[in-house]
Amino acid sequence: MVTAEGVREAARGLEGVAVRTPLIWVEPLKAYLKLESLQPVGAFKARGAFTAVRRLPESARSRGVITYSSGNHGQAVAWAANRFGVRSVIVMPETAPAVKVEGVKKWGGEVVFAGRTSADRLAKAEALVAEQHLAMVPPFDHPDVIAGQATVALEIVEDLPDVETVVVPVGGGGLIAGVVTGLAAAGSRAKVWGVEPVGAPKLTRSLAAGTPVKLDRTASLADGLITLTVGAAPFAHLLAQRDRLAGVALVTDDSLREAVHFLHRECRLTVEPSGAATTAALRAGDVRPAGTTVLVVSGGNVDPKFFED
């Protein structure tokens, strides 16, 4: 389990590396946005990926790193590896958005395509680990990744000590697990809402079952939130802070699309559907935040053609 000191150590390790992203007030939403879309790779994933790569033993890191990702975590691992001057291999789905594939290549990552599901990507990544002795950097199911994501919450509390609600998108659970852990480390009493697509209700199902549930299939406009399950480590952290969870909302693709356009039109922000999930949930009335509220905008890697719709 990630400790408060583990979160603070991650924050120290990210100083001068990750962007200390701002909070901006959006009057129509009556909420603040935490703009993780401003990270060097355009997503919060920079925090967890860099922390995990930094904490690897030098003997392992020097052989190169590998991950499996639909996009943003892959870009983050490639970026982190680039900063350490080591090789990175990113296993991506055949359906990965071009903007995310190019983002990986921008940081020197070697792209390997494998199927369409996270299981396809994981199998290929594990095979490459065995063949090439690369160090695996999981996208969400690892305490170092969770510790890095927890620094989002530390910054929120430092900038907004009276925060009462934080709304977080949910893919594999690394970010929401990090946020609940980071809020606890900061001594905040804020509650957390999770948001996931209607077509990928893995956290909703898992909380109901009391254990991580693997879905047969997922589908959503929010490609970063369609993992088949939440990770065991994130789920354990959520259960440890169960009283902090206010609820989990489900959003439709129509709501996601509207939220992306709203943020572009009203805030001049370029946000991908996964990053707009929190705004979508609030605008659709799917979350019912109490008091001072922060919506985490998790990423901004979206194809410009999206705005031609």
Regions found by a protein language model. Give the residues of each.
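PLP-dependent amino-acid enzyme catalytic core
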Residues: 1-309
